[in-house]
């Protein structure tokens, strides 16, 4: 029996039992047999959730790019590593082999070194989904620089916050990006961000849209000529197991985004192992994750996980609706995609178009369908199963987080019987538990509580960059000696897990975690706004959308309310990005508050969801009369 590739349910239970009874022996075996090390570890695991501190494979030395590229050169050198599908279907796809990837990454790594980037330096990457994005990530890892990828839909203000927090010395960007029918001025956004960033010494600019842009002497450099002149050989920097690999920012329920730090060895082992099993990846399969590398899904399951397994990974620059809603299926047919991993928000948008369009495409290559970003609702699950999988391709509803680094709870296709809306069973080595509000573990089945993890896994984020205190407070203070996920979950009669949603002030919109505090901060900058509260409400496509309750100052009450709404959404776009715009804005004379002055978001959430019969006792509020006003004027269409 190979612990590395699980093929049936009995084997899953055997391997799972071993992984939780002897976790150190289990992960040592996986690490030893399936990866390349410059030096083996002294200890497999040191951990203490009270500090909190987690260290895997301490004493080991390696470079993750040797595991993702170099070791494949003799056996898979000519195999396609990255298959790039451009935004415009008339533009030819690019097949980058492992040999070519090796040369491209080395050239890029040499450019970074030439520009003064050293091991431990932070590099911000603000690029569209073009090959340079994956290559620059790997080039940083090649020389031991810490990459910080920022999704290229974030605003200049959001980009500047992230650059400053990790003190990036370099930004890698492009002249612009294509997104469906739109062209986005990425370089202009970087220029705006850098007005408030003194740490950046160099900006490397890739050409994508080929338009004239502003280039600042001494700061901005075109990437192409530097790559052309660089050597295609670059020795990999030897890294310690616990050296940081990357920082990735995720929304917090309070203002500042959290720079999650992932380290080298444990992250590599866990993402590779989860990729192999969660997608039942086999040699010569073509795998496609539709996420952006700006999110953790793209880091783990477009770049590192697939390449560590010598896979062919598809990178798609565009959107599912351009030039029409058949684009995903056109790509599946064209490249004979075997594993397809997308978000419920995309599935719902495609389902809305009906199934006639799908009949034009041959989807018979599909073996596994994946879902990520939020729990998939039942209607979308059945549509995906019936129309895309033709009831033959299992759906893996994967639950995990930026903080976890890799998939945590998921069915294994052709192994775990699936159940709509359920993430089903914990992945190998993962020990989930459900807790009540009094810090008691809920044992047995048919229970619901707060989802925690009892024992460390190799790819857990080690800290928040520059703020270990916040890391402890956020993840390890709610429940003693356990990692708290921030999610609620239930365990059914057979032990399957279903994620019931966030229990903090984070709303998942189109699969993206949005903290309410930063959005409210942006709104409250408007001169006409006195106070605001943001809640989520169900949305057919996005899963959740944002509903804003806003009280105006005297100056705002006399203004045209539609104009104020537009200005508020523009402020949000400028501060955070268009992803955080409000779908509904209701102006109200006040917000319901406790006598201590706390806004009762629970009540506002119920009103936004049209559940006003479940408000409970509002008589203890400081201002109960405002609840009736809000209900009477609620925007429920």
Predicted regions and their residues:
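Conserved AMP-binding/adenylation subdomain of ANL enzymes
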Residues: 268-286, 296-339, 352-353
């Amino acid at each position: 029996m190979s612990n590395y590739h699980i093929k049936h349910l009995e084997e899953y239970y055997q391997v799972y039992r071993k992984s939780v009874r002897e976790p150190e022996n289990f992960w040592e075996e996986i690490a030893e047999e399936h990866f390349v090390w410059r030096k083996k570890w002294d200890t497999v695991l040191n951990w203490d959730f009270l500090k909190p501190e987690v260290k895997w494979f301490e004493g080991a030395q390696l470079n993750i790019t040797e595991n993702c590229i170099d070791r494949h050169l003799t056996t898979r050198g000519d195999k396609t590593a990255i298959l790039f599908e451009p935004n415009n279907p008339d533009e030819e796809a690019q097949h980058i082999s492992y040999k070519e990837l090796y040369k491209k990454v080395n050239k890029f790594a040499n450019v970074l070194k030439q520009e003064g980037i050293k091991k431990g330096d932070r590099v911000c990457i603000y690029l569209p989904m073009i090959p340079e994005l994956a290559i620059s990530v790997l080039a940083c890892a090649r020389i031991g620089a810490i990459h910080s990828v920022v999704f290229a839909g974030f605003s200049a203000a959001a980009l500047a916050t992230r650059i400053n927090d990790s003190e990036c010395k370099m930004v890698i960007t492009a002249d612009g990006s294509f997104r469906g029918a739109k062209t986005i001025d990425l370089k202009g956004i970087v220029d705006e961000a850098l007005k408030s960033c003194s740490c950046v010494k160099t900006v490397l600019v890739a050409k994508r849209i080929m338009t004239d842009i502003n280039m600042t002497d001494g700061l901005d450099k075109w990437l192409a000529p530097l790559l052309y002149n660089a050597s295609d050989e670059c020795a990999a920097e030897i890294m310690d197991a616990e050296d940081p690999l990357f920082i990735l920012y995720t929304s917090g329920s309070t203002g500042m985004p959290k720079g999650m730090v992932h380290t080298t060895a444990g992250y590599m082992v866990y993402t590779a192992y989860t990729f192999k099993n969660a997608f039942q990846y086999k040699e010569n399969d073509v795998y496609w994750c539709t996420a952006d590398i700006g999110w953790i899904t793209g880091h783990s399951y477009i770049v590192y996980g697939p390449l560590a397994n010598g896979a062919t990974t598809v990178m798609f620059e565009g959107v599912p609706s351009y030039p029409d809603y058949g684009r995903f299926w056109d790509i599946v047919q064209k490249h004979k995609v075997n594993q397809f991993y997308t978000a419920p928000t995309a599935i719902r948008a495609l389902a809305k178009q009906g199934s006639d369009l799908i009949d034009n495409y041959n989807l018979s290559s599909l073996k596994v369908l994946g879902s990520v970003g939020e729990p998939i609702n039942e209607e979308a699950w059945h549509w995906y199963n019936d129309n895309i999988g033709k009831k033959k391709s299992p759906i893996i509803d994967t639950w995990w987080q930026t903080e976890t680094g890799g998939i945590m709870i998921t069915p294994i296709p052709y192994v775990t019987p699936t159940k709509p809306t359920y993430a089903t069973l914990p992945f190998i080595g993962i020990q989930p538990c459900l807790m009540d509000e009094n810090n008691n573990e809920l044992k047995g089945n048919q229970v619901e509580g707060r989802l925690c993890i009892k024992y460390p896994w190799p790819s857990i984020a080690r800290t928040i960059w520059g703020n270990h205190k916040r890391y402890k407070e956020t993840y390890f203070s709610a429940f003693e000696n356990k990692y708290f996920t921030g999610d609620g979950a239930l365990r059914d009669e057979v032990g399957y897990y279903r994620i019931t949603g966030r229990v903090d002030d984070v709303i998942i919109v189109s699969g993206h975690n949005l903290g309410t505090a930063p959005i409210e901060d942006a709104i409250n900058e408007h001169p006409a706004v006195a106070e605001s509260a943001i809640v989520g409400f169900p949305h057919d496509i996005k899963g959740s959308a944002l509903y804003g309750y806003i009280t105006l100052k005297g100056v705002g009450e006399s203004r045209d309310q539609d104009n104020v709404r537009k200005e508020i959404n523009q402020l949000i776009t400028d501060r955070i990005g268009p992803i955080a715009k409000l779908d509904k804005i209701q102006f109200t004379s006040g917000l319901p508050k406790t006598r201590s002055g706390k806004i009762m978001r629970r009540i506002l959430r119920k009103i936004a969801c049209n559940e006003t019969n479940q408000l409970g006792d509002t008589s203890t509020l400081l201002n109960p009369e405002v609840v009736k006003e809000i209900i009477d004027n609620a925007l429920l269409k």
